[in-house]
A protein has these predicted regions:
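Short, solvent-exposed loop/turn segments at secondary-structure junctions
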Residues: 31-33, 64-65, 116-117, 178, ...
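Active-site donor-binding loop signature of nucleotide-sugar glycosyltransferases
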Residues: 30, 156, 229-231, 270-271
Length: 275
């Protein structure tokens, strides 16, 4: 479960949706949320989440997973083969639409995990789009980052790829979602976010945009909120006696000095990277 704790509203109001102030965000892993691992079954639990006080459901990636270089038998949600489809393991687009409709009926918001840095090595884009949509080595092979051997990094020097990424985001916004949690946001050039996100806000007023990242620049005309990673680890250290309230005071002052006043900070108890 994740908490978004935001302080007082800025004197010059930012373009944050009213519903996002002090909202409680619940991260949902569809595969593991119910024994069936489907959107249809997960939707049955939405009333319970509402009763718990959840405001926003953040769905981990629901898109098809690549097969090539797949890690394990099920693969990683973050090795996406098609940005505009639902993983058949979870159901269909119609199941997704019903999940979204039920959430909205209950007054809940739904944001999707968005992986803009890379796709799977056998993604539809690799098969159908020009080679220069991807970063390649001297031999023409797509490249991986870190130990992510199941991905291919996208090339943000390509204007057509950027436009297609924005169009894929619109695909889901047209279905009625309430925003995105953008995976590894700092790995994507900031100018892409600064160009794309304001345009999406104009077309879809009231959307909420969360960055997995902690760089102040993410708030420069781009995201509503960013991760408070440092605070999460600091609070764990305080709970275990390794740090003190003085360290917390120092963090609050340091973060306030570094971040724009209107920036929302995602203060979380846990997430899929930490649990």
């Amino acid at each position: 479960m994740v908490l978004v704790a935001c302080g007082t509203r800025p004197q010059q109001p930012a373009a944050h949706p009213d519903w996002s102030y002090n909202s409680v965000v619940y991260e949902m892993n569809v595969r593991q949320y119910t024994p069936e691992g489907t959107l249809a079954e997960a939707a049955r639990h939405l009333p319970r989440l509402q009763e718990m006080g959840v405001d926003v459901v953040w769905l981990m990636p629901v898109y098809p997973i690549g097969v090539k270089e797949r890690k394990g038998t099920l693969g990683s949600y973050y090795a996406i083969s098609d940005y505009e489809a639902v993983n058949p393991e979870f159901g269909t687009l119609e199941d997704f639409d019903r999940f979204l409709a039920e959430a909205h009926r209950l007054g809940l918001r739904v944001i999707l995990d968005w992986v803009a840095n890379h796709t799977s090595p056998d993604a539809r884009w690799i098969e159908e789009r020009p080679a220069d949509w991807y970063v390649r080595d001297s031999l023409g092979n797509t490249i991986v980052q870190y130990d992510w051997t199941d991905i291919a990094k996208l090339d943000y020097g390509n204007a057509d790829m950027r436009a297609a990424m924005a169009a894929a985001m619109r695909f889901w916004l047209n279905r009625g979602i309430d925003g995105f949690r953008c995976d590894m946001a700092c790995e994507v050039p900031i100018d892409f976010w600064q160009q794309t996100l304001p345009a999406l806000r104009k077309e879809y007023p009231g959307i909420y945009l969360l960055a997995e990242g902690e760089a102040p620049a993410l708030h420069d005309g781009a995201f509503d909120a960013s991760y408070a990673w440092e605070l999460h680890h600091l609070l764990n250290d305080i709970a275990q006696g390794r740090k003190s309230a003085a360290d917390l005071r120092a963090y609050v002052a340091r973060d306030a000095a570094a971040m724009p006043r209107e920036a929302f900070r995602l203060m979380f108890t846990s997430n899929h990277d930490e649990n």
